[in-house]
């Protein structure tokens, strides 16, 4: 014979007030937790971008140490012809940033190339005929990095490579590797003079200052 557990005749379930209170607590916790998680995720992206711009910058300097110049050869074999280099596997067909920028002007005018065509493979402009020399004391000895990727916000890292070969005394004095950062807008001057810092929430690594 099973014993019967007495039921509290006064306890028929949760009251409406209790349910509303519980839902309010859950909503409050969600309101606190979601922004915290979002902030932590954004901080992780920023940290990743800092690591990657530094890695790209060090690869640029390693290239310089073996070739004797920064990568600026175009598909015809002419040096000091590129103004911008950008990461990722393909050439963008439209402005990947949220605002107009000199970097995109250079890219769309044909004065740019993929970083990988210089640092990962010896194929300026994506071709294999006109290349950096591979023998002698000043030669291409890569790859200098693994295939580059987009930044944590799915936009290219960019390098104002013109600063690596220009002789201007007023412009192009700082060579940067840049991410546009969380807001997607490059606010660092592409024509960087000596006093021009990283702008906005851009994330940058200074490769060279001359």
PLM region spans:
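N-terminal secretory signal peptides that target proteins for export/translocation
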Residues: 1-9
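Short, surface-exposed interaction loops/tails
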Residues: 2, 46, 143, 150-210
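N-terminal single-pass transmembrane signal-anchor helix
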Residues: 10-41, 45, 52, 57
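Soluble non-cytosolic domains of exported or imported proteins
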Residues: 47-50, 139
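Short, glycine/small-hydrophobic-rich surface segments
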Residues: 60-144
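Short capping/connector residues at structural and topological boundaries
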Residues: 75, 149-150
């Amino acid at each position: 014979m099973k014993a019967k557990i007495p039921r509290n005749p006064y306890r028929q379930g949760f009251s409406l007030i209790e349910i509303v209170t519980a839902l309010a607590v859950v909503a409050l916790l969600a309101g606190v937790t979601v922004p915290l998680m979002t902030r932590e995720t954004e901080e992780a992206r920023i940290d990743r971008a800092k690591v990657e711009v530094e890695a790209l910058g060090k690869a640029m300097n390693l290239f310089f140490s073996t070739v004797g110049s920064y990568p600026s050869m175009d598909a015809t074999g002419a040096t000091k012809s590129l103004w911008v280099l950008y990461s990722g596997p393909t050439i963008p067909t439209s402005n990947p940033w949220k605002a107009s920028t000199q970097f995109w002007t250079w890219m769309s005018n044909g004065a740019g190339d993929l970083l990988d065509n210089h640092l990962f493979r010896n194929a300026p402009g994506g071709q294999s005929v006109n290349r950096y020399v591979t023998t002698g004391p000043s030669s291409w000895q890569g790859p200098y990095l693994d295939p580059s990727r987009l930044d944590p916000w799915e936009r290219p890292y960019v390098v104002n490579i013109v600063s690596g070969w220009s002789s201007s005394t007023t412009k192009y004095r700082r060579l940067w590797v840049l991410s546009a950062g969380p807001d997607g807008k490059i606010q660092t001057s592409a024509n960087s003079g000596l006093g021009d810092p990283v702008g906005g929430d851009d994330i940058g690594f200074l490769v060279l200052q001359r």
